[in-house]
Design a protein with these regions (language model features):
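Short, surface-exposed recognition loops or helix-turn segments adjacent to catalytic cores
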Residues: 91-94, 157-159, 204-207
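Non-transmembrane alpha-helical segments in soluble domains
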Residues: 76, 80, 100-103, 143, ...
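Short polybasic/polar patches that bind polyanions
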Residues: 20, 173, 195
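GST-like fold's C-terminal all-alpha helical module
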Residues: 106-191
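Short, flexible helix/strand-to-coil boundary loops that buttress conserved ligand/catalytic motifs
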Residues: 16, 73, 114, 175, ...
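GST-like domain detector, emphasizing the conserved glutathione-binding G-site
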Residues: 1-129
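Long hydrophobic alpha-helical segments typical of transmembrane helices together
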Residues: 181-210
Length: 210
């Protein structure tokens, strides 16, 4: 299987953490993509194989035989169903709905983080400080909501917890530790799960530039 990646993307990281938790890392060829800083607002010319794998030109993208998947949600669902027997996200029932509740909040954080980052990369005249603040505040509200769910996490590290941990890690790496004030119990939980091998192996780094 071929997975198109970049080390900065939290969407890529949640897939890679899932891959490591499922123990299937040796089944993948990881293809590093390169992006200019204008990726958020301008058309970026990419290699033909990448465009074929993902016409929407975003990462991650998975090519697995005759299956091509172009977002982290479908990739994780495919891998967990095919190789994990739905270990990361239950196929149905109350356990699934609770996990999806957590996952949706954590994904909302990721979306806000990426939109904030894209706006910050605009030139000064085009940048909206109000929009940047709006995305920051959205993320903090979601962290506060996840704080309320932290006691229910226990020792589990399924999809909801994985996405939450990735959201915590990206915010701290990109924007600093301010999120911890909104969610101290979540921060304590994060400090524990960040020691997992799957989290250590996927720590974020800047994307190679073109």
């Amino acid at each position: 299987m071929r997975l198109y990646v970049t080390p900065a993307s939290p969407w890529v990281r949640r897939v890679r953490v899932c891959i490591d938790e499922l123990g299937i890392g040796d089944s993948f060829e990881y293809v590093q993509t390169r992006w200019p800083h204008a990726w958020g607002t301008r058309t970026v010319e990419m290699p033909a194989d990448f465009v074929e794998a993902t016409p929407v030109v975003r990462i991650p993208a998975l090519v697995a035989g005759d299956v091509t998947l172009t977002d982290s949600h479908s990739i994780i669902d495919y891998l967990d169903g095919k190789f994990g027997n739905h270990r990361l996200l239950a196929a149905d029932g109350p356990e699934r709905w609770k996990a999806l509740e957590t996952n949706a909040l954590a994904c909302a954080v990721l979306e806000a983080q990426i939109m904030r980052r894209a706006e910050l990369l605009r030139s000064g005249a085009d940048r909206s400080d109000d929009f940047i603040a709006k995305m920051r505040d959205r993320g903090l509200r979601c962290f506060a909501a996840l704080e309320k769910q932290t006691p229910s996490f226990g020792d589990a590290f399924g999809l909801g917890q994985i996405t939450t941990a990735v959201a915590c890690g990206y915010d701290e790496w990109r924007y600093g530790p301010g999120w911890r004030e909104a969610a101290p119990a979540l921060a304590s939980w994060y400090d524990t799960v960040t020691q997992r091998p799957s989290m250590k192996a996927t720590e974020p780094a800047e994307t190679p530039q073109r």
